[in-house]
């Protein structure tokens, strides 16, 4: 029982030492990760300038993207193939 406790304690100490060593080598990683996360959140509030395939639309008012057509049956954008 004592041996398993010492082994578990040694494992935790080893995990702590390895974690500390890797953290000291990559101090910029958490800052870069947080800046990327917050940069992605900035784009959520912006409206897309152009409707894409599968986006909902109003038939007859698809002036945003000429290469897509608004399906009057399904009310979503589909690829315009021409007539």
Swiss-Prot record:
Reported tissue expression: Expressed by the venom gland.
Signal peptide: 1-21
Locations listed in the record: Secreted
Leucine amide sites (modified residues): 81
Keyword Signal on entry: yes
This protein's record includes keyword Ion transport: no
Molecular function GO labels: ion channel inhibitor activity; sodium channel regulator activity; toxin activity
Database matches in Pfam families: Toxin_12
UniProt entry keywords in alphabetical sequence: Amidation, Disulfide bond, Ion channel impairing toxin, Knottin, Neurotoxin, Presynaptic neurotoxin, Secreted, Signal, Toxin, Voltage-gated sodium channel impairing toxin
Main location: secreted
Cited SUPFAM superfamilies: omega toxin-like
InterPro entries for the chain: Huwentoxin-1
Positions of the propeptide removed during maturation: 22-48
GO CC list: extracellular region; host cell presynaptic membrane
Cysteine disulfide partners in this protein: 50-65, 57-70
Domain writeup: The presence of a 'disulfide through disulfide knot' structurally defines this protein as a knottin.
Record note on quaternary structure: Monomer.
The family this protein is said to belong to: Belongs to the neurotoxin 10 (Hwtx-1) family. 15 (Hntx-3) subfamily.
Role summary: Lethal neurotoxin. Selectively blocks tetrodotoxin-sensitive voltage-gated sodium channels (Nav). Does not affect tetrodotoxin-resistant voltage-gated sodium channels or calcium channels.
Protein name according to UniProt: Mu-theraphotoxin-Hhn2g
Species per Swiss-Prot/TrEMBL record: Cyriopagopus hainanus
């Amino acid at each position: 029982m004592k041996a398993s406790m010492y082994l578990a304690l040694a494992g935790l100490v080893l995990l702590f030492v390895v974690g500390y060593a890797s953290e000291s080598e990559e101090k910029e990683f958490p800052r870069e990760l947080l800046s990327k996360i917050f940069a992605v959140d900035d784009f959520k509030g912006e409206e897309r300038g152009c409707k894409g395939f599968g986006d909902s639309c109003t038939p007859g008012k698809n002036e945003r993207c000429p290469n897509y057509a608004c399906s009057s049956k399904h009310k979503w954008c589909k690829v315009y193939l021409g007539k």
